[in-house]
Curated annotation (Swiss-Prot):
It comes from Xenopus tropicalis. GO terms for molecular function: zinc ion binding. Keywords: Metal-binding, Nucleus, Repressor, Transcription, Transcription regulation, Zinc, Zinc-finger. Acts as a transcriptional repressor. The gene is irf2bp2. Residues 224-259, 270-281 have a biased composition (Basic and acidic residues). Its main location: nucleus. Residues 73-84 have a biased composition (Low complexity). PANTHER family: INTERFERON REGULATORY FACTOR 2-BINDING PROTEIN 2, MYELIN TRANSCRIPTION FACTOR 1-RELATED. This is Interferon regulatory factor 2-binding protein 2.
């Protein structure tokens, strides 16, 4: 015997993928011998269910299980004792079962090697059909003993050579759903949709392949028959899609928590048509928009102020509520509705405040890439965190501004004046909202770029952008380092040193005045010492 035949005789077939595997690649811990690849693919916790489903489908198709060579003598006893227990099947094997059903797959192996001993309760003892003549072979290929579209085997290559062949039509590289469509697998070849049990899958499989159950499958399937099956399958998928849409309409009347749970379940088990279409169905987006009170109130809150003087009818926030956006694709609507959740209500900042609101939607849509949307959401999150307290609308972003800020803190400071008014409806104070809406540019704040230059409260000299002392209680109290040093020396650095303005500014939320910490005093005074040393030298 050749070395290839010897190697092939040592291999055992996996119950799920039917590929010849070496003994060390097989796992005997489950109800059927399966290879490590299938266990890793499905997960050890799901593999029993998959084996069970495979067994049901094989029985429903009248599938002869005589293809797999038996296990090695050392493990045959364990396999025969476990064969009476039930096993399972994966999404990827359903596609293979549809076209290998009744097919003469045993030809390849039995033509090259004598059949190994088989367990009587699992494997039939019928003789394989004789090899086909060369004139009968078509364009179909057989990879690892698995028949591809037209069902012809190609026995001139040993299985282990086929395993390594760089065949582009290898079943592992074909999408599972497409393989199922080509090869005549039942509709349930993806993960089981909601509401479909294994029993109903078996019934559907038996119905769709009843033409093939009368003995062996013919050598070739006519193209008209194939097209008819394809149409039948497409109709079934469209019916599934219609069921999901009607379900989504029924959910509108349910409570919000129930509706959200149902939505999440539907998205995680979406059928073929919603998985492979480019745009998600707009019905779900609009029902989400229409039933989200937070997004409505957010859009109303955002509509109170406008950073640019366009008339109300052209504002971007009006179009965000789902009524006035016929031109907006469903994917963009989904993106906007995500960003309109209560913690990120900032409609005007989704488009640049200086851009022309009357431009066609393509311009705004192309300008907003998914990455830009992610960055924007991250910036908004930072801004919300920084201005959590309604009474310190701006001071929180400046509390640590005596040290050079990181780029993320600069982003927070830049976003703050735009974010704060849009958060007011969810629990801020109306006085700050009125101040922000009436004079959005009048605050002497470092967070507004290109605005009024920062000046020291005492000497009115212009301050550097990051190198000054900021009172944490009063936003307008900003001091240069020379004035701060002078104030510390006047108050005496040994005791409590309060705000350089001369007032005892209370901490936010209490009557206790804030005072410099010793480390801060040392830092401010240290600059003075360094300057003197430089002058002396």
């Amino acid at each position: 015997m050749s070395s290839a035949t010897v190697a092939a005789s040592r291999r055992q077939s996996c119950y799920l993928c039917d590929l010849p595997r070496m003994p060390w690649a097989m796992i005997w811990d489950f109800t059927e011998p399966v290879c490590r690849g299938c266990v890793n693919y499905e997960g050890a916790d799901r593999i029993e269910f998959v084996i069970e489903t495979a067994r049901h489908l094989k029985r429903a198709h009248g599938f002869q299980e005589g293809r797999s060579p038996g296990p090695s003598p050392s493990s045959s006893s364990s396999s025969s004792s476990s064969s009476s227990v039930k096993p399972q099947l994966s999404a990827k094997e359903m596609a293979q079962i549809g076209h290998t059903m009744g097919g003469p797959e045993g030809v390849t192996r039995t033509s090259q090697q004598p059949p190994p001993p088989q367990c009587l309760d699992r494997y039939s003892l019928e003789r394989p059909p004789p090899p086909r003549l060369g004139s009968e072979y078509g364009v179909g290929r057989q990879v690892n003993g698995i028949l591809l579209p037209n069902g012809f085997p190609k026995p001139e290559e040993p299985p282990e050579l086929n395993r390594q062949s760089p065949n582009p039509r290898r079943t592992s590289s074909v999408p599972q759903s497409l393989g199922a469509l080509m090869n005549g697998a039942p509709i349930g070849s993806g993960r089981t949709p909601v509401g479909l049990s294994a029993a109903s899958l078996v019934a559907a499989a038996a119905a769709t392949t009843s033409a093939d159950l009368s003995g062996k499958r013919p050598g070739s399937v006519s193209s008209s028959e194939h097209d008819g099956k394809e149409k039948h399958r497409a109709d079934s998928y469209s019916e599934l899609g219609e069921n999901h849409k009607s379900r989504a309409e029924e959910w509108i009347s349910k409570p919000k928590t129930v509706r959200d749970t149902l939505m999440a379940m539907q998205h995680s088990h979406s059928p073929f048509d919603s998985k492979f279409k480019k745009d998600p169905g707009p019905g779900r987006v609009l029902s989400f928009e229409a039933n989200n009170p937070a997004s409505k109130s957010g859009a109303r809150g955002g509509r109170k102020r406008k950073p640019s003087p366009e008339p109300e009818g052209e504002g971007g926030s009006v179009k965000m509520n789902g009524e006035g956006q016929p031109w907006l694709p469903a994917a963009e609507s989904l993106k906007i509705s995500t960003m309109a959740s209560p913690s990120f209500i900032s409609p005007p900042s989704t488009v640049s405040p200086h851009s022309n609101r009357t431009t066609p939607p393509e311009a705004a849509q192309n300008g907003q890439s998914p990455m830009a949307a992610l960055i924007l959401v991250a910036d908004n999150a930072g801004g919300n965190h920084a201005s959590k307290d309604a009474n310190q609308v701006h001071s929180t972003t400046r509390r640590n501004s005596s040290s050079p800020p990181s780029p993320s803190s600069m982003n927070q400071r830049r976003m703050a004046p735009r974010d704060v008014p849009s958060q007011i409806p969810s629990g801020g104070t109306s006085s700050h909202a009125g101040m922000e809406q009436g004079h959005p540019q009048s605050i002497p704040d470092s967070s507004i770029p290109n605005s009024i230059p920062l000046c020291c409260t005492l000497c009115h000299e212009r301050l550097e952008d990051t190198h000054f002392v900021q009172c944490p209680s009063v936003p307008s109290h900003k001091f240069c380092f020379p004035c701060s040093r002078q104030s510390i020396k006047q108050q005496g650095s040994s005791g409590e040193v309060y705000c350089p303005s001369g007032e005892k500014c209370p901490l936010v939320g209490s009557n206790v005045p804030w005072a410099f910490m010793q480390g801060e005093i040392a830092t401010i005074l240290a600059g003075d010492v360094k300057v003197k040393k430089e002058r002396d030298s």
